[in-house]
Amino acid sequence: MALAVGWSVCVMASAHDALGISDWIGNGTYMSTTSANLACCGRNECAIIEDGAARYMKDGIEVHGDATYFIQRAPWLHQRIDEVVPYTEIQPSEDKYFWRCQWPSPTQRSEARPHRTCFFAPPPGS
């Protein structure tokens, strides 16, 4: 059921954010590493992590800083992130930036507690 809902949202969206820069996430076949059968859709669900906010550490990538959602038009939506993402949950970033996806997105109304569904990172040192 969740897979069908996730895929239908992806199919209906022509751009995954106002600028189209996260389209590679939704256009790919990326699936959540934390939620069964949930696509990393991208439509207002994925935010770019600000430069310098993510660091490779022993147990995962430590994030302390803002994530920016490119929703509709400026001013963009900023969300403070303070977490450690285990290496087992990290997927390769196609554009060399750190990206964090969550469901429900900041613009969705839901009883569900927002949680990280996908995290994309460039290779260390790139």
Protein language model features and the residues they cover:
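Processing junctions and N-termini across compartments
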Residues: 9, 34-35, 95, 112
